[in-house]
From Swiss-Prot:
Coiled coil: none annotated. It is found in: Cell inner membrane. Keywords: Cell inner membrane, Cell membrane, Ion transport, Membrane, NAD, Sodium, Sodium transport, Translocase, Transmembrane, Transmembrane helix, Transport, Ubiquinone. NQR complex catalyzes the reduction of ubiquinone-1 to ubiquinol by two successive reactions, coupled with the transport of Na(+) ions from the cytoplasm to the periplasm. NqrA to NqrE are probably involved in the second step, the conversion of ubisemiquinone to ubiquinol. Composed of six subunits; NqrA, NqrB, NqrC, NqrD, NqrE and NqrF. This is Na(+)-translocating NADH-quinone reductase subunit D. It comes from Shewanella halifaxensis (strain HAW-EB4). The gene is nqrD. Its main location: membrane. The keyword Nucleotide-binding does not apply. GO terms for molecular function: oxidoreductase activity, acting on NAD(P)H, quinone or similar compound as acceptor.
Length: 210
């Protein structure tokens, strides 16, 4: 049985110390695509966290009964089933956001973070620790998405969650939105800057040279 200290480390470690995007550079494609608005970034964070946490839990419960030769197929079947459930829930209760996220919810099936944690962690770790690891990695993923989404929506459109924050020139205000921030390449540069900031703060994350 895991103690509170271990659970806390598993839950909080992926936020900065072992962030799946900033340190492991996983899940970057969806991060580029869904961060033009805070709403889509938040919903994608919740979707991935739910899938990652529960896939870890179910795979961990079954880990001693899964033949090694078919473990990847079993993992993907569990992940795909959860993604279908999440996608159907989004389409039922948040249809507009589901349309904006388009195929990226479905692509959680092949997200490196989800598959990586299932194979590297859940297959070797008890259920509770695996579940908390899934939540922690989802939060770490979301921390980057929401940081990038905050900058892109605020300075690219003058709003947050669709609510105007900076009064735009076109509406008689003072702020001229930077349309470049709404384009996917801007997310790439912002994520790069966040990685630089985190690795400056924690230099032990920098890869050894040579």
């Amino acid at each position: 049985m895991a103690n509170a200290k271990e659970l806390k480390q598993v839950l909080t470690g992926p936020i900065v110390s072992n962030n799946p995007i900033a340190l492991q550079v996983l899940g970057v494609c969806s991060a580029l695509a869904v961060t033009s608005k805070m709403e889509t970034a938040l919903v994608m964070t919740i979707a991935l966290t739910v899938v990652c946490a529960f896939s870890n839990l179910f795979i961990s419960i079954l880990r001693n009964h899964i033949p090694s030769s078919v473990r990847i197929i079993v993992q993907m079947t569990i992940i795909a089933s959860l993604v279908i459930v999440v996608d159907q829930v989004l389409q039922a209760y948040a249809y507009d956001v589901a349309k904006q996220l388009s195929v990226f919810v479905g692509l959680i099936i092949t997200n490196c973070i989800v598959m990586g944690r299932a194979e590297a962690y859940a297959m070797k770790t008890p259920p509770m620790m695996s579940f908390m690891d899934g939540i922690g990695n989802g939060i770490g993923y979301g921390a980057i998405l929401l940081s990038v989404g905050f900058i892109r929506e605020l300075f690219g459109n003058g709003s947050l969650f669709g609510v105007e924050i900076l009064s735009k020139v076109s509406d008689g205000g003072w702020y001229q939105p930077n349309g470049l921030l709404l384009l996917p390449p801007s997310a790439f540069f912002l994520i790069g800057m966040l990685i630089w900031i985190i690795r400056t703060y924690k230099p032990e994350q920098v890869e050894a040279k040579g």
